[in-house]
Every structure is written in structure tokens, then in C-alpha cells.
Amino acid sequence: MKFFRSVGEVFGYSPFRSLAQHARMCGRAVGLLQQQFEALRRGNYEEVEELREEIDELEHHADQIKEEIRGNVTKSLMLPVDRHDLLEFLKVQDDILNNCEHVGHMVTFRKVSAPEDVWDEFLVLLSKLMEIVNNYEEMVERIMQLVETSFSKKEVNRALEYVPIIEQLEHECDLIQIGLHTKLFNLENSNPLDIQLMVTWVVHLGYVANAAARASDRFRIMILGR
């Protein structure tokens, strides 16, 4: 006879608390990227490198949590959501951190010179990214209330209210990216290598926003597919 365990019977282990902790790290990573770009603007490359190391450490810690969840969410563990949906959600959420790490490395490749209005636009983009991940974190934090209330309709609706907000913010992020690309491609007195690298930054910052939007959709699938 197949033996099933409840979530609370695995030495108190809860994949949902770990999922929420992993989501908080996404917000922390975007916050570190903001600091990196502020340091870039000031030309403080030592701080840029230190922040890259912080992002690397954060991503490594997040990977440990990810592997902990994968190792504990076995087929014999009884869950209130579909196991495959939970692991797919975790995979996409992890893309937020992976893309933050990529950007954190790319800004150390070269000392870039850019006009002040370009740095202004990068910080506007990062501010919008921070808004996205703040809403994303709040959404994932709701998962504990969902579990505690046995996924009551009221709590499900409250949690899923964040999904269209995140999607709208991701669209606004796209518009900022378009404006920033236009500005970069019209720089006449800048080094072409600097422009090329900054364009790559814009693209990968967009990947962070896209990952958050995709993860919010996977969250919705996980909650509604139970």
C-alpha cells in the first residue's frame, strides 16, 4: 500500500514557507541591482563589484532553498496543490534571480560612460522592476494564508488580485525599455561598445520583469489547478 505523508509530517517542513523565502530573495536581488546602477552612475566600480558578489551569494543561497524544496517535495508528500505545478512555479520564480545575477555580472564587464539622462532612465526602469517584485513578493506571501484557510475562495481571490497588477507593471516596463533603447541608439558621441553593452543591460533587465510576470502566471495556474 502506498504511504502518503502530509506537509506537516515531514519534520515540520513546509514547501510554502520556503517558496515565500525564495520569493523575498527575488526582491532583494532587484534591490541590489538598483544599488549597482547607482554606484555605476557615480563611477564607484569597487562598490559595483562588491554588490555583484552580494548578488552571487544571494543567488547561491536561493539555489540551496530551491534544491531543498525539490528534494523534499517527493511524490509521496501529500500537497494541497499539484506537485508538478509547484515545481514549475519554483523553476520560473528562480529565473528572476538568475536574470538578476546575469545583469549583476554584465555591469562589471566594462567601465561605461553615459550621459546623465541615460542613467536617469536606467534608474526609472529599475524602480519599475522594484515595483513589480514588491507586488510579486506580496502575492507569494499570501500562500501561507491560503494553506491555513484551506484555499478559501476569499483568500484565493485576494492572492490572485496581484496577477493583473504584475502584468500591467511588466507592460509599463516594456514601454520604458523601448524609450531607453531609442535613447541609446541615438547617442552620437558615445563609444559603440558602451552602447552595445547598455542595450544588453536593458534586454536582460526586461528578462527580470518577464520572469516575474511568467512566475505570477504559474502561481495562478498552481492555485487554480488544485
Swiss-Prot record:
UniProt-listed InterPro entries: DUF47, PhoU-like_sf, Put_Phosphate_transp_reg
Cystine pairs: none
Superkingdom of origin organism: Archaea
SUPFAM superfamilies attached to this UniProt entry: PhoU-like
Record family assignment: Belongs to the UPF0111 family.
Protein's recorded name: UPF0111 protein AF_1799
Originating species: Archaeoglobus fulgidus (strain ATCC 49558 / DSM 4304 / JCM 9628 / NBRC 100126 / VC-16)
